[in-house]
Amino acid sequence: MEKYSLVVIFLLFNIISFGQIPGPSCNWYFGTNAGITFNSGSPVALTNGVLSTTEGVATISDNSGNLLFYTDGLTVYHRFHGLMTNGFGLFGDMSSTQSSIIVQKPGDPNIYYIFTSDNDVGPNGICYSTVDMSVGLGQVTSKNVQLKTPSCEKLCAVRHCNNQDVWVISHDWGNNTFTAWLVNSSGVGTSTSWSNTGAIINGVSQSAYGQLKASPDGRKLAACHYGTTTGGMNIVQIYDFNPATGFVSNGVTLHNQLGLYGVEFSPDGKVLYAGTNQGLLLQWNLCAGTLAQVQASRVQISNAGPFIGSIQRGPDGKIYVARNNTSLSVINNPNVVGLGCNYSDLSIPLANRPGRMGLPNFASFYVQPQFILPEPTIVCNTVNFSFPTSQSTGCLTQNIQYTYLWNFGDGQTSTEQNPTHEYLLAGVYNVSVTINGPCTSTTINKVVNVPPGGITVSLYTN
């Protein structure tokens, strides 16, 4: 009886694919009638947007990449770019760094929540409004339910450990408190978490400016706390986040710099970028070692001049940078430490529409990489292929362990990370691996054709 040897090599942290781009984050509207779409794989300028915002904005599409609606935190526009029913008078502000963020209600495909933040430590603080997409082009059914005031101009969202619910997170004003509201099938705020960590954010109101972002795996947060020559925090900090409890901890300062505003994690979660109002784009290697070593890893990626505004990870695995210009800048290889990240200034044209300082604010799980298996290499009768993934370990202070369960489709399994498996018969096999970690579970499938004699092997995504 012939044997067919299939050597399966699991390569952690090396390969991510963004082959399936259509999804909730593939259409962006921002600035003065500016926008881009990723539906073709690469960013293409949109010219049908109607909003005009200097900073904050949020957009949402369905899983097929069809636009649903977008907002500057004040007004909601439906997919045909008209005013959504009752979509006016929200309590965000177009001059708030992260004026809004949109999350779908768990378990209900028709209900979305728009969370808004007031600008300049305004009295409206953090509120939420409800959108029902089962009614025509959508309808705002409730508005401006206040959750917290005063607050910084910061909003981000992270998936809960149960892979269903969502944490929406902001930073209070006048203290070092993070507030995280749970969004579940019962609605908003059935559970709220408060955490005290990091710097106290107070003084001049400009300290409230700047982005708050979550790493792709939801286990790290980073925040820029803006400032000016006359005062303010002028710091970028990084924190641990527990997606099971909503608790934020271990806040540390990476850097002090005038005018820090935009911040973003690389797709693999190992590199951090931040920008300033003088036009500096900075990078840190979060896996450099100790805190001091991470701080010392800082690299100046660009000094192209003002202004580095919002920095946003895209669904294509690149990072986009708002520059208050009719073009965006892009970091083409954001997982690469140093100048090899390939920053390209003002290289994404916006059809002569001003992009201003903001980019759409997405929940971290709406811009997750898709895991797609590469084609195998064949050496004699041995087939080598990779089941790649990229789970961020957070690097700073975290040591996350993963377990693996392989099913080779012939009744045999393995819990090794890098197993070797021999098939006794030719045929077609459904191979899968499930990777489990703290608050994460990912299953990757592949259909494997094992031919007689092991001469040729073809793989295709299941």
Task: Locate predicted features.
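Beta-propeller fold recognition
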Residues: 20-377
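Short, charged low-complexity linear motifs
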Residues: 12-16, 116, 221, 294, ...
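Detector for intrinsically disordered, low-structure N-terminal pre-sequences
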Residues: 6-7, 114, 139, 432, ...
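Generic anion/oxyanion-binding catalytic loop in active/binding sites
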Residues: 8, 48, 408
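Bacterial Sec-dependent N-terminal signal peptides
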Residues: 1-25, 259-261, 380, 429, ...
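A generic alpha-helix preference that emphasizes hydrophobic side chains
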Residues: 11-16, 56, 125, 175, ...
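Extracellular/lumenal mature domains of secreted and surface-exposed proteins
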Residues: 366-462
